[in-house]
Amino acid sequence: MPPGDRRDRPATNPPHGKGLSAMALSELSDVLWTERRLLELLLFKLEEEQLVLTSGRTRWLAHATREVETVLDQIRDAELGRSVEADAVALELGLEPGQSLQALAAHAPAPWDDLLQAHRDAFVQLTTEIAQLADGNRELLAMSHRATQETLMSLQESVQTYDPQGHTTAAADRSAQLLDRSF
């Protein structure tokens, strides 16, 4: 067994007598705090992205999006850690692995039950805010895309090209049009 493995640590017996390790609950709580901080950071990064979108400074949009993706990767890693710790707590509580945080809170002894419920409530609040902000950012991107396409369409009326003799063609000649297919 590697040093620091949970099986090396002595289990403490909580007052309810189920033999639940306070260490397991403490480790789960630590992982939950980390995940909460990451969700708050994601919320901040989404707000930054929104500020970039609303300010029209799209030059920084790629950077803002990359920062959001970086935080999302960190959240995925934290979720894996949370899953491992939550399964360990579930087993110690006599539950099947894969239980929800609410189910763990319902079966955990005091004061852990309140702490786990508080984490769950915070996650619900944060994910609601994140979903609303992400939806708003998608809407801003869609509006920006439509505005760009409308601008490009208005440019088509004044596009002039050259004929084989090198003379410009009139705008009424619709044989050539400016079209950006990347949109």
Predicted segment positions?
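Extended, charge-rich alpha-helical scaffolding segments
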Residues: 2, 15-104
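Short helix-onset patch at the extreme N-terminus, typifying the N->h transition
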Residues: 7-8, 28-32, 178
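Generic cytosolic/nucleocytoplasmic N-terminal low-complexity/intrinsically disordered segments
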Residues: 12, 17, 136-137
